[in-house]
């Protein structure tokens, strides 16, 4: 913990599958105009989703299964093996699984793996999809979410409840600033 009021990067998170698996990383190389590497590379569509698998382009989050629909998704952790592009997924209620989502059979295996943590009244998972060259962020342009630890701490104190950074799905968490100074 630092006492200065100089901003510094406290945490870096990426989410290889949108809303399904967070991974804390120590460092990352950023490229102007691109999402954080390995962030939201994949997204999970549901039956009758409007996402066009045959012409994959950026789409709003409403066409994907996500934590607001399936809250148990938020407990998934991921570890990207950058050497081969495979990902290890873990969830407290499921057996760990290690897959290469570039492989069709592994994508089908992922859908089977995630099905038990989908609510019964929610749309059923259908296909894992991606858009070449960008992550499936919530913006229609490649973006990186930068959040403030001090603002999160202040919000937690006001709510009298610990809020974990993973709840907000941010990429880069900075600290060393006054709460809410990012809004000034």
Where do the PLM segments sit?
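Electropositive, beta-rich accessory/interaction domains or terminal extensions
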Residues: 5-182
